[in-house]
């Protein structure tokens, strides 16, 4: 039998040949006009607009920069340049307008447009090898340039993903996060990094957490790599902003929305063992409205590295499919977005398999969000997010109907307000409610098969630019959990940026609430094991301290060194205890859960050698 406990530790840190003939291809549907403008409709009684035309060029060569993005800062919407770098966009009449111009490999630039200007605008961009103007959001829940963020953030751009053409999201993460690896076991793909497993690494999609399967790991096959805008990676504890489980690392996968009137792609990949991957999407954007439809399907016949045992494969045959729809609308002050995704997965037994059953699962995800600006100083965000998982037992050797053996329902409602009372002060505050309801036919015993937990949260963060070179960020979250009670998680980050140097230091506290399995497990597998939960478990806490130094020279060299320590207290772990008089056919031991301790110290020194001179 098994049981959980908390430990204290410092961690040093797819079979169609026709499809094969198609090969791998990408379709880019051209827009109805060459200008590919995205111009939301602004009400006449709100802001009168006029067409502004211009061109984006390289400051050194004068050559056009195609597909640059143009944003009208005052209106909150924009356009995309055509293949000759030309653009057409609505700007306010008789009012000053500020354009934010971005392009891959160039420094972001803000351009002031004088009232009455309607044509002939030329925007010159300077090349940047380091992409130091990349905008990040995960570390503070507000948009900041990566070089201005007081919390060190690693960014994997869409261009990098397209250049490497990764097969799956697991490949993306494993190749871009040092020390991260996946261990495949019967439960799924388990992440490990610096000694910490799945439950200590928070995976977000557009800021919302992905739910885990009943076995523990996240099914990354749900995620397409084709519509990713960027991936932001934040080391250490971030519970002040994101709550439970943000103890070892936060990975925020930020998806893209359509920018052209019509765009799309289709990709096919085929390999040995009838491994087939299909990935396609189509997007529309017109006068502030956008729609995006994604389709992804994977299938394989599996493979066996032990032919002497044909009844069991190294990897079983499987197939999965994901369909996602996202729609939205925005105008000068308001943005509305809704999305839904449906993911089916089935892992079958080998042709000569002896197991009487296999599993089929369905994951349904729904999201709705509203953003409204009450002026330049105040923005309000409201989000609902629901993730609903169902696992079904399919009988292969017995004539029985399929039966649901497990469900997991996770829902979140959050209200966030961003307020700037002064030009150098920004306050983020909000409230959040989370509900979890799990049903499991076997995990919680025979008498009670449904378990629930919920929590209510209040959080606040203040970002104070004390001096042009000095930025201080402090935050705090209070959580009330239905089982263990209260949790308090503060954070503070400081960045000093004299000249070409940047020095960062920070402290943050993380926490992880005990899971339903750890609390209420009563899973008796006879002579295999008996897992027993512990309803008296305390939450796990971590204290994360980091310091870093960064140097940038002439936009062509960037070097940094970072050291951090993550101390975890009351870590939940399992241990075996002996049973004096086991029942017939059962083991003489049980696995229980309790709290323990761990420590980690890591020094990380990435260096990016680039040409120092043009």
Where are these regions (language model features)?
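Short, acidic, small-residue-rich periplasmic hinge/interaction motif at the N-terminus
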Residues: 38-47, 55-61, 68-73, 102-107, ...
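Short, acidic Ser/Thr/Gly-rich low-complexity loop/linker segments typical of extracellular
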Residues: 75-86
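Short acidic/polar hinge/loop motifs at secondary-structure boundaries
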Residues: 88, 208-235
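Extracytoplasmic beta-strand/coil segments of soluble accessory domains associated
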Residues: 88-90, 170-208, 229
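N-terminal periplasmic accessory domains that precede
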Residues: 119-124, 169-173, 189-192, 204, ...
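Periplasmic-side early beta-strands and strand-to-turn transitions of outer-membrane beta-barrels
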Residues: 240, 260-261, 269, 281-361
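Face-selective signature of the C-terminal outer-membrane beta-barrel domain
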Residues: 328-345, 360-484, 490-499, 503, ...
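Outer-membrane beta-barrel signature, preferentially recognizing the C-terminal barrel domain
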Residues: 354-373, 406, 502, 509-569, ...
């Amino acid at each position: 039998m098994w049981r959980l406990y908390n430990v204290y530790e410092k961690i040093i840190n797819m079979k169609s040949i026709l499809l094969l003939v198609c090969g791998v291809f990408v379709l880019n549907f051209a827009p109805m006009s060459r200008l590919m403008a995205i111009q939301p409709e602004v009400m006449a009684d709100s802001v009168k607009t006029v067409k502004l035309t211009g061109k984006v060029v390289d400051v050194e060569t004068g050559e056009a920069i195609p597909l640059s993005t143009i944003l009208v800062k005052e209106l909150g919407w924009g356009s995309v340049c055509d293949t000759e770098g030309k653009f057409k966009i609505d700007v306010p009449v008789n009012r000053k307008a500020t354009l934010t111009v971005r392009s891959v490999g160039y420094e972001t630039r803000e351009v002031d447009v004088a009232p009455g200007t309607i044509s002939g605008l030329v925007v010159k961009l300077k090349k940047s090898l380091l992409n130091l103007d990349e905008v990040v959001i995960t570390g503070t829940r507000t948009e900041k340039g990566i070089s201005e963020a007081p919390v060190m953030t690693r960014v994997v751009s869409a261009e990098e993903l397209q250049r490497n053409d990764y097969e799956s999201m697991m490949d993306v993460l494993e190749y871009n996060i040092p020390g991260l690896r996946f261990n495949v076991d019967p439960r799924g793909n388990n992440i490990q990094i610096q000694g910490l497993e799945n439950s200590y690494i928070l995976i977000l999609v557009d800021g919302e957490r992905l739910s885990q399967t009943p076995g523990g790991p996240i099914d990354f096959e749900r995620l397409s790599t084709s519509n990713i805008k960027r991936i932001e990676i934040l080391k250490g504890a971030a519970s002040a902003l994101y709550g439970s489980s943000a103890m070892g690392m936060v990975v925020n996968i930020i998806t893209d929305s359509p920018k052209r009137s019509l765009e799309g792609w289709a990709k096919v990949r085929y390999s040995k063992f009838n491994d087939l991957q299909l990935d396609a999407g189509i997007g529309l954007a017109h006068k502030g409205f956008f729609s995006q439809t994604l389709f992804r399907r994977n299938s394989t016949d599996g493979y066996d590295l032990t032919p002497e045992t044909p009844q069991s494969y190294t990897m079983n045959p499987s197939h999965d499919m994901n369909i996602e729809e996202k729609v939205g609308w925005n105008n000068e002050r308001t943005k509305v977005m809704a999305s839904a995704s449906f993911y089916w997965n089935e892992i079958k037994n080998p042709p000569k398999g002896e197991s009487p059953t296999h599993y089929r699962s369905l994951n349904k995800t729904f999201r709705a969000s509203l953003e409204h600006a009450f002026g330049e100083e105040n923005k309000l965000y409201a989000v609902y997010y629901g993730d609903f998982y169902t696992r079904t037992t399919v009988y292969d050797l017995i004539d029985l109907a399929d039966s649901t053996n497990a469900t997991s329902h996770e829902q979140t409602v959050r209200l966030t307000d961003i307020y700037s009372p002064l030009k150098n002060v920004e306050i983020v505050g909000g409230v959040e409610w989370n509900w979890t309801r799990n049903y499991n036919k076997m995990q919680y015993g025979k008498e009670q098969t449904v378990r629930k937990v919920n929590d209510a949260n209040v959080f606040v963060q203040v970002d104070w630019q004390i001096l042009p070179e000095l930025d201080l960020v402090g935050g705090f979250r209070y959580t009330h959990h239905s089982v263990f009670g209260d949790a308090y998680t503060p954070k503070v980050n400081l960045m000093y940026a004299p000249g070409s140097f940047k020095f960062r230091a920070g402290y943050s506290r993380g926490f992880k609430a005990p899971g339903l399995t750890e609390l209420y497990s009563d899973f008796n597998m006879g002579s295999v094991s008996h897992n027993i939960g512990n309803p008296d478990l305390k939450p796990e806490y971590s204290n994360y301290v980091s310091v870093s130094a960064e140097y940038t020279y002439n936009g062509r060299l960037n070097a940094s060194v970072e050291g951090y320590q993550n101390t975890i207290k009351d870590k939940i772990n399992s241990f075996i205890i002996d049973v004096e008089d086991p029942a017939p056919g059962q083991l003489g031991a049980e696995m229980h859960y309790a709290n323990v301790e761990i420590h980690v110290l890591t020094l990380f020194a990435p260096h990016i050698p680039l040409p120092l001179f043009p």
